[in-house]
Amino acid sequence: LEQEVKNLDFAAQDFLTVNMGATAIGTGITAEPEYAEMCIEALCKITGLDIKLADDLIGATSDTSCMVGYSAAMKRVAVKMNKICNDLRLLASGPRCGLGEINLPAMQPGSSIMPGKVNPVIPEVMNQVAYKVIGNDLCVTMSGEAAQMELNAMEPVMAQCCFESADLLMN
């Protein structure tokens, strides 16, 4: 998982390039010439981050690859966590048949017809989290390709999916 965390950090760097002052389609028309510089300066001061203005404001307005990339990095974490949880479920299968290589702590009552059975509820919950993150990534991917010309009207659902996935993975 250490490599996946590094991938998340790397993907997050794309969010430091913004299109402030680009206006609706990235031309900057009707915006005060100093607006972008003032915004960048204020954002850097407020966040303490090294935020930069995009070189191509038109491209930055329609391109949502920063969200697509970050969502994909979160999906990689989810896929790896899912595999680990599947391994835990298999290794903990038992007690009379199955591998029974490890014993997971009982988090709830087991089966009434199989005494001693411990349901792998924590790995199962993590499987469900992974499936949701993977589904959110599909939504972000499809929304990213839904841009038409200079504008992507799908950014709200992309942001919602990214925030939800981040929240699920952190908790």
Map each language-model feature to its residues:
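Conserved, well-structured ligand/cofactor-binding cores
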Residues: 2-171
